[in-house]
Amino acid sequence: MISVNDFKTGLTIEVDNGIWQVMEFQHVKPGKGAAFVRSKLRNLRTGAVQEKTFRAGEKVSKAHIENRRMQYLYASGDVHTFMDNETFEQLELSTAQIEHELKFLKENMEVHVISYQGETLGVEVPNTVELTVTETEPGIKGDTASGGTKPATLETGLTVQVPFFVNEGDVLVIDTRSGDYVSRA
């Protein structure tokens, strides 16, 4: 058991018969009344995000998540194959299980596969990934004065807003948490 006062971003807990990951939390001490913790939780099974309020000092069960380093091998229809780097055991996940992460996955990429009591919950990609621009409008001389952006399609099909100086074939660093352009690689 863990106290809600000890919440940290990324902590996994068991609440209401679900496995939840703490995305955000805030300790609130109103002028009148008892303190409480307002949190934003993501269900690791369904991906649903829910806001939940706990009384200060309330205890919740900590979920012991197994985190294995694996390599993304390939996709075959709606099935995506991963390989354990130590045992070379292969694992297949459906598109529905890793829908959000697919926008950032490239073949041979190292990821963390999360499981709870033998049930695979999903995939964690690195905080930033390097992806190649496959399609974007060419930058026109003089455009950069305004510091604007233009859409660019990346090798995984993800579309992001990028500065005007980015061209097709450029390798970009993308933040996987927000899906935003960070820099050129």
Swiss-Prot record:
Cross-referenced Pfam families: EFP, EFP_N, Elong-fact-P_C
UniProt function note: Involved in peptide bond synthesis. Stimulates efficient translation and peptide-bond synthesis on native or reconstituted 70S ribosomes in vitro. Probably functions indirectly by altering the affinity of the ribosome for aminoacyl-tRNA, thus increasing their reactivity as acceptors for peptidyl transferase.
GO annotation terms (biological process): peptide biosynthetic process
Gene Ontology terms: cellular component: cytoplasm
InterPro entries reported for this sequence: Elong-fact-P_C, NA-bd_OB-fold, Rib_uL2_dom2, Transl_elong_fac_P/YeiP, Transl_elong_KOW-like, Transl_elong_P/YeiP_cen, Transl_elong_P/YeiP_CS, Transl_elongation_fac_P
Family affiliation: Belongs to the elongation factor P family.
Superkingdom, taxonomy of origin: Bacteria
Pathway: Protein biosynthesis; polypeptide chain elongation
Protein name per UniProt: Elongation factor P
Keywords assigned by UniProt, alphabetized: Cytoplasm, Elongation factor, Protein biosynthesis
GO molecular function: translation elongation factor activity
Primary residence: cytoplasm
Gene3D superfamilies xref list: 2.30.30.30, Nucleic acid-binding proteins
Organism: Halalkalibacterium halodurans (strain ATCC BAA-125 / DSM 18197 / FERM 7344 / JCM 9153 / C-125)
Coiled coil location: none
UniProt-annotated location(s): Cytoplasm
